[in-house]
Structure formats: structure tokens, C-alpha cells
Amino acid sequence: MLQNVTPHKLPGEGNAGLLGLGPEAAAPGKRIRKPSLLYEGFESPTMASVPALQLAPANPPPPEVSNPKKPGRVTNQLQYLHKVVMKALWKHQFAWPFRQPVDAVKLGLPDYHKIIKQPMDMGTIKRRLENNYYWAASECMQDFNTMFTNCYIYNKPTDDIVLMAQTLEKIFLQKVASMPQEEQELVVTIPKNSHKKGAKLAALQGSITSAHQVPAVSSVSHTALYTPPPEIPTTVLNIPHPSVISSPLLKSLHSAGPPLLAVSAAPPAQPLAKKKGVKRKADTTTPTPTAILAPGSPASPPGSLEPKAARLPPMRRESGRPIKPPRKDLPDSQQQHQSSKKGKLSEQLKHCNGILKELLSKKHAAYAWPFYKPVDASALGLHDYHDIIKHPMDLSTVKRKMENRDYRDAQEFAADVRLMFSNCYKYNPPDHDVVAMARKLQDVFEFRYAKMPDEPLEPGPLPVSTALPPGLAKSSSESSSEESSSESSSEEEEEEDEEDEEEESESSDSEEERAHRLAELQEQLRAVHEQLAALSQGPISKPKRKREKKEKKKKRKAEKHRGRIGIDEDDKGPRAPRPLQPKKSKKAGGGGSNATTLSHPGFGTSAGSSNKLPKKAQKTAPPVLPTGYDSEEEEESRPMSYDEKRQLSLDINKLPGEKLGRVVHIIQAREPSLRDSNPEEIEIDFETLKPSTLRELERYVLSCLRKKPRKPYTIRKPVGKTKEELALEKKRELEKRLQDVSGQLNSTKKPPKKASEKTESSAQQVAVSRLSASSSSSDSSSSSSSSSSSDTSDSDSG
């Protein structure tokens, strides 16, 4: 009896899953235990029902992978889908359930084909690509879309298979974002042995379909193509695979479902541009294939893409490979021209280039992909996009501008990147997923941009610090003297040329060169005499208006904008006294640096005043010694003018290091806000100090400088208020040059020494009169002007 039962039992073993039998019966390959005689009657009805079950409907035929009647072709986009997209998905660890059609019979899913009317899997798509089944890339993308959608329709959202499908779909969308924008047909010549290869491929593809099959593997899209309510059987709840995807990812992928319905309404007449919908923030918030291709859009007719194929350059027919448009001859020459035009990136732009590479890297691709390419508003049906966004921007444009060296500095680069993000925020609602992606990417950008290295800057004006050592103050004042007036610089160049030529003449023994050199120097001497005579006669006839000018200048100082001060300076008097200071520095050695500070009004304050002071230009300097006042209190409370503050800052820098401690003590004693500051390094802003503090500083500085043997205030005198004084100083400067030229004449040749001695003695007399004139009042200065002019006439006659 037992022997008769066993053969009848075995045929039903393969259908145990469908019958709902116990796990022992369902397990394939398990030995059937011998039933006892007790249950003989129980098993006999089962035997009778086996033939009926064998009549159950089998799986429907798989989707076709080739159709001779349906024209297919090879395009650049289809080739990209085959070689790049399919290759990446096929090798993924979650791809195994999607590599072959769903075997509903084997998996015990009797309702699968009732719910899913159009099954699709990656194996079918792969074989269709290999057989050139598709006419356009949009058809292939529609098949991917169907596969993912089927999976979402049939299974519960919490099932592992759904999470696996979402992961694959995300990778699919990222890859499609980099697909060529314009679809072009590629002409492929079939080699002679293609039939053998095709047979091998068919055999290989046939073996793929016999692989292990898994339940409920379908397809992805948040907009369901089929509306029947999903009836989810409990048999699909647990899929034996270790990988589980986090729930935040699931939420992020599901969150943008409803808004994408609007995108899917894009006109289906542009299937090759549909892929761009995946790429852009304003168009598709979450990576969903609805943006790629509207569900239910008709397949592209065979002739729809013919014009684009006609644009291709002529192909070589003897090659079996798909030939791409020529990219060697023309781009090479262009690259050579571009490389010659491209300059070296600055340090900051190199950092920006690194930021750009990071934004385009795979590390951030999950939320950066919508920003890779420009928004294709027409393909995505965003008809108001360019009305709202006037200046579109994307990372590919930024990259192109960076490669073409269009960015002059890092600020221009940052402006374009921030424009891209602001466009996203402007066009999309705040709760849109693409806005969240933009914020995440912008965080990456701002974090990296904050680490921007500083460009090596030219040394600028130093802030005022009373703790600066005198040597540092000297160097800053000397740097300011280099920016003196054009007149003084030209005169200095003449003198330097003279000195250089003098050295050359000394080194040469030729008598002719010495004679020629002597003639040149005498010519220069004559020109200096003429200039001196003209200056000494000019300003004497003009009346004095010193007091009126002082009052006018005070009023104008309060009213004028800082930028107009330089104009007044040109109107009120010549820039003659400026050349005097460089001369003094040559003659006086170390003390000359203090005089140099005054050589250029705009920059002289850099060593001795606050950051505010250098912005103004000096008009005139007040009398150095404080004038008499009725009372000491009145003097202390009298506010200090800008020129006085500037002069005070210059004087402080002239003090030796041991005197600066007292300056700090005066400031800290009279200014409560600075009492806690570090005495080693204290910054003085003269605009914030009290008038009494400034007057006390002025008194102390004057007392220190008055003790010195050289008279420092004669240097400040040239910045006088009247044109007479300016002309006088110009004349003295010319006398000084005359003396220098005379010295050169002496060194050049011995015979004319008598004449040069005579000239030098007269110049020395002039120098004595200059010292006496500078220490006297304004009245005596005018008298010294006449005396110096008489000296000049003597020197001319000599």
C-alpha cells in the first residue's frame, strides 16, 4: 500500500506552494516521510485532485525582445543606456530580483498577472538593447519606468523589495542625468561574422532567463500607470536579502509624488528631451521617472528623429564600430589656442576650482544632480520658468566659465554658484524636495568657501600704533614718500641720472667725454638759475591774504567731501614743497625719514594715524607752535583740526622709542576707554580722542622735539598756507639743486672749480638765509624771500 502511495505523491510535490501544504511538503528535495496506514483515507482525496491542479494556468509569455516588423536603431542615447546605465544597474547588489521576469507560478503569486498587466524586467530591457529593439531612448526609459512602477504597485511600501527598487531607481536617475542631451542616430555597419555572434548572444541571453527568480519584482514610478488597488499577499513580506535601506530614504523618495504629476503633463512630442527633467531642481524635485517620460506617452514614430540623424557628419563605412562625430582634428587646434590663452589661476581661484570639482563629485551626487545641467524649460513644461528666472545658472556653466578663465576672482565664482541656488529657491516652493537638496549642496559649498586662502596682498598702510618701533615707522613713511608728486619724482630721476652719469664720467679717461659732460651740467645749471629767478620775482607782487585763507580753509574743510580735497589742494597752490622732503632725506641721512612722511599728504598718515585718517588728503598744515590763548582751559578745550591731528600723528612717529611710553601714559590717563588696553600695542584713533588729550599730546611732543639740535619744524613749514611761502620753498629747493649741480661740476673737472666754488658759496649763503627765514614769523619769511632773491642774482652774476 505504501509503495502505491509514494509514486502518486511525488508529482504534487512541485505544486506544494500553491496548494497551501505544510512546509515539509513545500520544501523541494526533501524526503517524503512514509504516511501511516491511519491516514490512508486522508491522502486519497489529494491524489484525485492532482490532475485538476495541473490544469492551472501557467505564466504568460515573457515580453518580446526582438520584432522584425518593428524598426529599431542605434542612437547615442540608447548606447549610453546600454553601456553605462544598464551596466551600473546590472552589477548592483540589489539588482538580482529584477534580472529576469517574475515567475508567478514558482513564487506562488496567483494574482500577480491580474494586477500587473505589463510585466517588465532588466533582463528583457538588456536583450532589447542588444537586439536594437528600441527606436528612441524614451522607449527604453519607459520600460525602466514600468519595471519600477510594477514593483511599487504590487508590493507594500515597507517591503524590502520596494526599498531595493527605490535604490536602483535613484541610481538610474542619476545616470540618466548625464546622458547626451541631443539624440543622434549612429550608423553601424554589420560585420560578416555577426550572425555567429548573434547566435552566441541569443544562447547567452537564454541562459540568463533560467536564473533564480524572486517574488514581486516589478517597477518604479510614483505616478502609477495602473490604478487597480494593490492586493498584497503575505507571501511577499520577507525576502531573504541582508541589505535593508533606511526609512529616511524611503520618505524622501515618496515625499514628492503628488507634485510630479504636473511635470508628467509635459508634451510627449519631445521624448529625447524628457531626460532633462531628471536633471533640474526647478523641474523634478525627487528623482522620479515621471519627469523623464510622461506615463502613457506614445512611442516615438520612426520618422520623428530622422532630421537629427541627417545632421551627422559623414561616416567611414569600412569600420564596424559606431563612429562618433569627429572630435580630434578641430578640438585639438581649439585646445591649443585655449591653452595659450588660459592664464594661471590664482590661489583663490584654484581653491574655487577644487570646490567645483567636489560639488560635481559622486560624493554629493545624491543631492547635486539636479544642478548639473541647465533647466530645459520647454521639455519640462515649465513655461513660466524664464519669466521668473532671468539669469539661469548651473554647475556645467560654472565649470565652463572656470575652464575658460572667465572668472577674475573668487567673488565672481561664488556669485554664480549662489545665483544658481537662489534661482532654485525663487522658483520652487519652500517645502519642495529640490529646495532641500539645494540647501544641502549650498551648505557644502559655503563650508568649503569659508576656508578660502588669502591672496598674497601688497603691503598696505599700517594702522597707527604708538608701540611701533621707530625703524618700522621710518619704513612706512619712506614707502609713502615713493608716491610723491610727479614733479618731485621727475626731479629725483634727473638727479639720479646725473649721479650715474657722473660715476661713468669718473670711470672714463676720455677728455672728450668729460668736456661733453661738463657742457651738459652747465646747461642744467643755467636752466636752474632761470627757473629760480622766475620764481623769486613771481609771488612778490601778490598781496598777503593769510588770515582770510585760513578762515576759508577751515570752512571748506567742514563742508567738503573727502574726495574733493585733492582738487582744492591743486587750486590753492602748486605742489612745489613736496620735492623738498626727498632732498632732505638724502642730505640728512637718518633724520630724513621723518621729513619723508610729509612728502605725500594722502599717505603720510599711514604710519601715525588711525585707519580713518589716510582716507583724507591734507590741504594745509597749521602753524606748528601753539599760538597764544587767553587761558589754558580755553586752549585745552579747543578742538583740533584734521591737519593738526595729522601733524600730531607724524610727530609721534618721530619720537624715539623711549619717549613713546609717556605718550601711552597720557592717553590712558585721559581716556577711560583705553585704560585697560595693552600698553605694548595700542591703536590711536584721533577722531575718538578728547581735545584736551590731543592738546596734552601736542605739548609733550613739541617739548620733546624742541630739544633736538636739528629743527624738525622747519620741515613742516613748507606745508604753509600762502602761495608766497610755497614759492619761497620752491626757490629754496632749486637753490639746493643748484648746490648739488655745482658739487657735480667740481667733481667732474678741476679747472671750472673756481666758478663752482663761487656758486657753492652763494648757495650756502642762501641755505643760511633759508634756515633763518623758516624759524621766523610769516612777515620775516617774506623779507627773507627778497634777501634770498638778491643772493640768487649774485649767484647768477657769478
Curated annotation (Swiss-Prot):
Keyword flag Nucleus: yes
Domain (Bromo): residue spans on this chain: 73-179, 343-452
Compositional bias ranges of the Acidic residues kind: 480-512
Feature: compositional bias, Low complexity: 284-297, 772-792
Region (Disordered): 1-21, 53-72, 267-348, 455-648, 735-798
NET domain mapped to chain residues: 630-712
Family annotation (PROSITE patterns): BROMODOMAIN_1, BROMODOMAIN_2, NET
Residue span of motif Nuclear localization signal: 553-557
InterPro entries hit by this protein: Bromo_Brdt_I, Bromo_Brdt_II, Bromo_chromatin_reader, Bromodomain, Bromodomain-like_sf, Bromodomain_CS, NET_dom, NET_sf
Positions annotated to bind a protein: D111, Y154, N155, K156, D159, D160
Locations listed in the record: Nucleus; Chromosome
Basic and acidic residues bias spans: 315-331, 637-648
Written domain comment of the UniProt record: The first bromo domain specifically recognizes histone H4 acetylated at 'Lys-12' (H4K12ac). It also specifically binds histone H4 acetyl-methylated at 'Lys-5' and 'Lys-12' (H4K5acme and H4K12acme, respectively). The second bromo domain recognizes and binds histone H4 acetylated at 'Lys-5' and 'Lys-12' (H4K5ac and H4K12ac, respectively).
Family: Belongs to the BET family.
The protein's assembly and partners: Homodimer. Interacts with E2F1. Interacts with (acetylated) STAT3; promoting STAT3 recruitment to chromatin. Interacts with CTCF; promoting BRD2 recruitment to chromatin.
Purpose of the protein: Chromatin reader protein that specifically recognizes and binds histone H4 acetylated at 'Lys-5' and 'Lys-12' (H4K5ac and H4K12ac, respectively), thereby controlling gene expression and remodeling chromatin structures. Recruits transcription factors and coactivators to target gene sites, and activates RNA polymerase II machinery for transcriptional elongation.
Protein's name in the database: Bromodomain-containing protein 2
Species assigned in the record: Rattus norvegicus (Rat)
